[in-house]
Amino acid sequence: MNPMEEKVLEIMREVFGVEDVTTDVSQKNCEQWDSLRHLALASELEDAFNLELEPEEIAEMTDFSRVIAMLESKL
């Protein structure tokens, strides 16, 4: 796992308030990943990686791999 992936998992654990968040996490398998926490996740990612996300990009962040792919395309 690279440093960016580790940082994203750390942010997800904080935002969702769940310690056992793994690379398999998605909106479908994480009860805590609701609409408010989705926006909080986007905000934390913007701050951590010093970038600005478009609404379409935020909407597409439905699981760990999509978050990583989106970040890789922006960095």
Enumerate the language-model features and the residues they cover.
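Short, cationic-aromatic polyanion-contact patches
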Residues: 63-71
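Two-component histidine kinase catalytic core, primarily the HATPase_c
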Residues: 37
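Phosphopantetheine carrier-protein modules
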Residues: 14-32, 48-60
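Thiotemplate assembly-line natural product biosynthesis machinery
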Residues: 1-21, 71-74
